[in-house]
């Protein structure tokens, strides 16, 4: 419950006041101290470089595991499409399918158009499962190299299909 309260405030008037000045004869003394500048040696430079190189390599390795591509389900203009609808990824890279339009969508891989030996049930959503709200996601990581075709079951007839190539 919101409420509004009002109050009256009296503000005093300071008209007719005069500013006064005080003369001071204080002396301020500042002393400075000499600071030795740090010396850079080749040994410490190489050590710092080595630490930085190891940290950079670790960051790249961790970032490589966290790599993901985002595929939008539906265009900003209301179109029924995967955006992008044809792309390539590295083996094991995560694909995040994100409903950005709020229409019911899903991601189903075509069992006839995936590499042999891949279990379509392990990588697809069930055709009856839907991502209904904007921002809902479905994630999958494809580990077998090859070409995978996928579609949105409710909108496949409208051309909402895509293809991913795993390198």
From Swiss-Prot:
CDD domains per record: Plastocyanin
Membrane-topology descriptor: Peripheral membrane protein
4Fe-4S in keyword set: no
GO molecular function terms noted in the UniProt entry: copper ion binding; electron transporter, transferring electrons from cytochrome b6/f complex of photosystem II activity; protein domain specific binding
Residues annotated to bind Cu cation: 105, 152, 155, 160
UniProt keyword annotations, A-Z: Chloroplast, Copper, Electron transport, Membrane, Metal-binding, Plastid, Thylakoid, Transit peptide, Transport
Family label: Belongs to the plastocyanin family.
Transit peptide per record: 1-52, 53-68
Protein name (database record): Plastocyanin major isoform, chloroplastic
Keyword Flavoprotein: no
Record organism: Arabidopsis thaliana (Mouse-ear cress)
Subcellular location: Plastid, Chloroplast thylakoid membrane
Pfam families associated with the record: Copper-bind
Gene Ontology terms: biological process: copper ion homeostasis; negative regulation of translation; response to copper ion
Role description: Participates in electron transfer between P700 and the cytochrome b6-f complex in photosystem I. Seems to be the major plastocyanin in Arabidopsis.
GO CC aspect terms: chloroplast; chloroplast stroma; chloroplast thylakoid; chloroplast thylakoid membrane; nucleus; plastid thylakoid membrane; thylakoid; thylakoid lumen
Cofactor: Cu(2+)
SS bonds (residue pairs): none
Boundaries of every Plastocyanin-like domain copy: 69-167
Cross-referenced SUPFAM superfamilies: Cupredoxins
Gene name of the encoded protein: DRT112
